[in-house]
Every structure is written in structure tokens, then in C-alpha cells.
């Protein structure tokens, strides 16, 4: 039976010797690291990399592309990935996973030939049992070690240990890996002791890759949880945060945790999430000492929805019409392909522009507004996935993205090919996922290409001027038809009344039976 895991091993590749990327555990042996090849065999046969003998996959060169001039430290982040591995598995057909020994999302079976419905639904519309199951599944993922993934505990120069043969890695849970991956994508580039770290890098925000990066991020968590639960149909639900008002409808003990009665910024002790602890909190230490975020947990989740009285703008959730306005924008993104872009669907759903597309440095809308509304762990970019509301918030953001792709019949050709922020170009590999996956591969409709779909209702679309004219013409024609039909009925009715005033037949008119007795009477 084929494994359904698509997990990878997170190995940091960073400046001056810090390795940062995502690799399978099988690739982080001393021999694997020295070979610079990560093509494990699903059958554990050295002669069968990526299942090439049976056909699931093949070992290919990893294509690296140079960053633009806006990034002066070429080789400091993902470019150093080539030092760790320059070859990876590329799976065929419906096969998937780091060694092509599993199935792609939405498929199962020995040959990955059976489709499995993976339907993401509104979390508020789940039954009580379904809500309980989801909450417990998240908690299980928080505690369960990832079956295929470990993280580096030393920089690249120290990764083989003092004896040059003991690799420096540790286990991490499924959910904490989800948090760690996001932290890495926004972390600064460490340039060495005594130097300020370079902060002009964000692989997952403020650029075209915002939507594609988070889409794959969610796919990895969903797939890991499917494997954990032994259920390939498990789907992450979404939180429709565009409800307006200042109430967090999912902040109940039945779902993501109510507000604590003793501390307005804490989660109720009746919620399982009050016992969760965050990782990747020591940002100053990482940036100044060059240490690595590891699996060590620290403080509890903080959350105070609508509690930021210093910023009234973030005390209310987005409105339903904000989503519809955003969906009506026709351009996916616009120069400079950054948080200052106008008339950009991506920048509007991300929340740096107004829903209608106009850029305003003061505005925070949609995705950004929902994060800031939470007013705590979920409102800090490097920490935000520690609050599990992050999952529901981003699943809805992805649902809006998928609806936009459907409405505008868009394909990857409209995704910027170049001149975007570091890591955001169309054919760039998204950092730090392994095996490598490009932004273009995620710029597709989900149901037809990625193995999952949404059960969602969207606000009615406003009519375009052409549609308004068409409706007016049709309405006028219908009105004429109704008037004509009514006039015809009146004329016909008057005719019937005239006929009703005519005299009855008298005796002067012959009757059949009287005129000819032999005639048949009907």
C-alpha cells in the first residue's frame, strides 16, 4: 500500500552557513547531505530513486533562479539551498510526496487512481460533532510528531556536529511545523555577529506570492492531518470573517476558544487551546545571535478580539460587500507588485488596499484586518499561525482567491513573470517548501487541479453597465408583450360578450330530426 505522506524535512538554508529549506528525514544523513541529492526511494531501494522503476516519479535537477537587484545578498537564503540538495523527486500522474510514494491531494488507492472528495466548508455550518472532531484533530496535530520531518538545530557550518558525522536535527509536531514554516518565510537574513540582520525579505507576504504561498502552506497541513487521521477526505474548514461587527463568532469554547473571564487577552480555560504554547517567539535572539527557531514552546496564545482601542479601525471585521468589491477587480496584481499596488486583487484581498482597489497607506482590510482584529498572537506576522484561527482565516482567504480565478477565467500567464519582490516571480520556487513547488503551480482552480473544493456562497454580483442595458431591453420587451397579450384578451372578451347578445335559434331553423326522420341523431 502506498504511503499518503507528502511531508518533508525542514532544513534551513541561510546566510553565512545557516541551512534553510524543507527536506525529507531520509535526506539528512551525513551521506545524504554530502551527496547534495534528495531523491529517496519509496521502496527503500538504492537503485529506485523516487520510485522510478515502477513509474511514480523521477529524480530531476532543482532549477534555481537568480533574484533581482533588489536583493543584495545572493546566496544568503534559498540560493544556499543548492549546497544542501541540487536534485529532488518530481512525481508523475497522481502520485505525490517527497519520494513519490504517496498520492497527490484528492487521490487514494494503490495506483492513486481513486478520487476522494475533499470539501472545505464553513466552520459555522458544521454540526456539533463535526466541530468537536475538528478541534480535537487540531490538538492532535499540535502534539503528534511529524512522521517525516525534523528541523535543524544548528547553522549550516555546524549541521554535521563537532565530529563532522552527527547531524543536528530534532523532531517537531505536525502543527508546530506549520508554524515554523511560516516563521521562516518572513524571517530576516542573518549576516553575522555584530551586523544588523537584513529584513527586506518576505517570501509569503506583500507580493503576488501571498496567495499561492499560503495556498500550498494550507495544503501541506491538510495533507499531513489526512495522514495522521487515516482519512484522505479530511478537509480544513474556513471562517467567513466578512461578517462585519465587533463580535468574533468562532471565539467560543465549542470552537476556537472563548475569552477568559479573568484575563481579557487570554483564552478561556474551558478551551483546549488555552493549553497551547507558541513557538518561534524569540525574534530578537534569532536576529542578533543567529540562532534558529526550534520546537521549544514558550508562552500561551494571546487573543483579545476587537480589543485594540488605540486603533478603532481594527475593532470591526470586514463587511460582506468588501469581499464582493474585491472579487470584481479584474487585475490579479499591478506594478510595483507590492503592498503599495492599486487596482490589484491580490493587494486588496491581502488587505493593504481598500476592497475596491485603491491604495491607502492607512487602510487595512480583509485578510489583514481579520488578523489585526484578533489583537494578539494572531496579529503578529511571525507568530500568527500559533493561533489556530490562522488556519480558518487563511482557508477563507484561499476560497476568495479560488472564486476570483473562476470568475475571471484566469491562468498562470497573468501572474507576473518577473520584477516582483524576492521569491514572488511566477516560476520561482516558494520558500521553504520541499520538494520545490513554484508559484505558477498554485495559480490554478482548486477543484480541477489541486484535489479540493469549497462549499461556499458568495454575495450577488453587481450588474455591469452592459448587463443593466440588457436587462432594461428585455424588461421593455416583456412589458410590450404583456400589454399586447392583455389587449388581445380584452378584444377577445368583448367579442364573446357581443356573441352572447345574439338571439337563440328559432323554430324557423330546421332540426335534423324534424326534417328527415331517417337522419341519425347525434
UniProtKB/Swiss-Prot annotation:
Signal peptide (UniProt feature, chain positions): 1-21
Residue ranges, Lumenal, melanosome side: 22-470
Name under which the protein is recorded:
5,6-dihydroxyindole-2-carboxylic acid oxidase
Details of cofactor binding? Contains bound zinc ions after heterologous expression in insect cells.
Show the disulfide pairing. Answer: 27-38, 39-59, 50-89, 91-100, 103-112, 248-251, 280-293
> Which residues does the annotation flag as glycosylated?
164, 171, 294, 375
Q: Which gene encodes it?
A: tyrp1
SUPFAM superfamilies recorded: Di-copper centre-containing domain
Tell me the InterPro entries matching this sequence: Di-copper_centre_dom_sf (IPR008922), Tyrosinase/Hemocyanin (IPR050316), Tyrosinase_Cu-bd (IPR002227)
Q: Does the keyword DNA-binding apply?
A: no
User: Where, subcellularly, is it found?
Assistant: Melanosome membrane
Q: Which organism is it from?
A: Carassius auratus
One cellular component term from this protein's GO annotations in UniProt: melanosome membrane
Residues annotated to bind Zn(2+) B: 367, 371, 394
Q: What is the lineage of its organism?
A: Eukaryota, Metazoa, Chordata, Craniata, Vertebrata
Co-factor requirement: Cu(2+); Zn(2+)
Pfam families listed in its UniProt record: Tyrosinase
What membrane topology does the UniProt entry give? Single-pass type I membrane protein
Keyword hit for Lipid metabolism: no
Reaction(s) catalysed (UniProt annotation): 2 5,6-dihydroxyindole-2-carboxylate + O2 = 2 indole-5,6-quinone-2-carboxylate + 2 H2O
Known EC number:
1.14.18.-
Q: Which domain of life is it from?
A: Eukaryota
Amino acid at each position: 500500500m502506498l504511503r499518503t505522506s507528502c511531508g518533508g524535512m525542514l532544513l534551513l538554508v541561510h546566510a553565512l552557513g545557516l541551512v534553510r529549506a524543507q527536506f525529507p528525514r531520509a535526506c539528512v544523513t551525513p551521506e545524504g547531505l554530502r551527496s547534495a541529492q534528495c531523491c529517496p526511494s519509496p521502496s527503500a531501494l538504492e537503485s529506485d530513486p523516487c520510485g522510478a522503476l515502477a513509474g511514480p516519479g523521477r529524480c530531476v535537477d532543482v532549477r534555481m533562479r537568480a533574484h533581482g537587484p533588489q536583493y543584495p545578498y545572493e546566496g544568503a537564503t534559498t540560493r544556499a539551498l543548492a549546497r544542501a540538495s541540487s536534485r529532488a523527486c518530481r512525481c508523475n500522474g497522481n502520485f505525490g510526496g517527497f519520494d513519490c510514494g504517496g498520492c497527490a491531494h484528492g487521490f487514494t488507492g494503490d495506483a492513486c487512481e481513486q478520487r476522494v472528495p475533499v470539501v472545505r466548508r464553513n466552520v459555522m455550518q458544521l454540526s456539533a460533532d463535526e466541530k468537536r472532531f475538528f478541534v480535537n484533530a487540531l490538538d492532535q496535530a499540535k502534539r503528534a510528531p511529524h512522521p517525516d520531518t525534523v528541523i535543524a538545530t544548528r547553522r549550516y557550518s555546524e549541521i554535521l556536529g563537532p565530529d563532522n558525522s552527527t547531524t543536528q536535527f530534532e523532531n517537531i509536531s505536525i502543527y508546530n511545523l506549520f508554524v515554523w514554516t511560516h516563521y521562516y518565510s518572513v524571517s530576516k537574513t542573518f549576516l553575522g555577529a555584530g551586523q544588523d540582520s537584513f529584513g527586506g525579505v518576505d517570501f509569503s507576504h506583500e507580493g503576488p506570492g501571498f496567495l499561492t504561498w499560503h495556498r500550498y502552506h494550507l495544503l501541506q497541513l491538510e495533507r499531513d492531518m489526512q495522514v495522521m487521521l487515516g482519512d484522505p477526505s479530511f478537509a480544513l474548514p474556513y471562517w467567513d470573517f466578512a461578517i462585519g461587527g465587533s463580535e468574533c463568532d468562532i471565539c467560543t469554547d465549542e470552537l476556537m476558544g472563548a475569552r477568559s473571564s479573568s484575563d481579557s487577552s487570554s483564552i478561556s480555560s474551558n478551551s483546549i487551546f488555552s493549553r497551547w504554547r507558541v513557538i518561534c517567539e524569540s525574534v530578537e535572539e534569532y536576529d542578533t545571535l543567529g540562532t534558529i527557531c526550534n520546537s521549544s514552546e514558550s508562552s500561551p496564545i494571546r487573543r483579545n478580539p476587537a480589543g485594540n482601542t488605540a486603533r478603532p479601525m481594527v475593532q470591526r471585521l470586514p463587511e460582506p460587500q468588501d469581499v464582493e468589491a474585491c472579487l470584481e477587480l479584474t487585475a490579479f496584481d499591478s506594478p510595483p507588485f507590492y503592498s503599495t499596488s492599486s487596482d490589484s486583487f491580490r493587494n486588496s484581498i491581502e488587505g493593504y488596499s481598500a476592497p475596491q482597489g485603491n491604495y491607502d497607506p492607512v487602510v487595512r482590510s480583509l485578510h489583514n484586518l481579520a488578523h489585526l482584529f484578533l489583537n494578539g498572537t494572531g496579529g503578529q506576522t511571525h507568530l500568527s499561525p500559533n493561533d489556530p484561527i490562522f488556519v480558518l482565516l487563511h482557508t477563507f482567504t484561499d476560497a476568495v482567491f479560488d472564486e476570483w480565478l473562476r470568475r475571471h477565467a484566469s491562468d498562470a500567464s497573468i501572474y507576473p513573470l518577473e520584477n516582483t519582490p524576492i521569491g514572488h516571480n511566477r516560476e520561482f520556487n516558494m520558500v521553504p517548501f520541499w520538494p520545490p513547488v513554484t508559484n505558477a503551480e498554485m495559480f490554478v482552480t482548486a477543484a480541477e487541479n489541486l484535489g479540493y473544493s469549497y462549499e461556499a456562497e458568495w454575495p450577488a454580483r453587481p450588474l455591469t453597465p452592459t448587463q443593466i442595458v440588457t436587462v432594461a431591453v428585455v424588461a421593455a420587451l416583456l412589458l410590450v408583450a404583456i400589454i399586447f397579450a392583455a389587449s388581445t384578451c380584452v378584444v377577445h372578451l368583448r367579442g364573446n360578450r357581443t356573441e352572447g347578445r345574439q338571439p337563440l335559434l328559432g323554430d324557423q331553423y330546421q332540426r335534423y330530426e324534424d326534417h328527415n326522420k331517417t337522419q341519425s341523431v347525434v
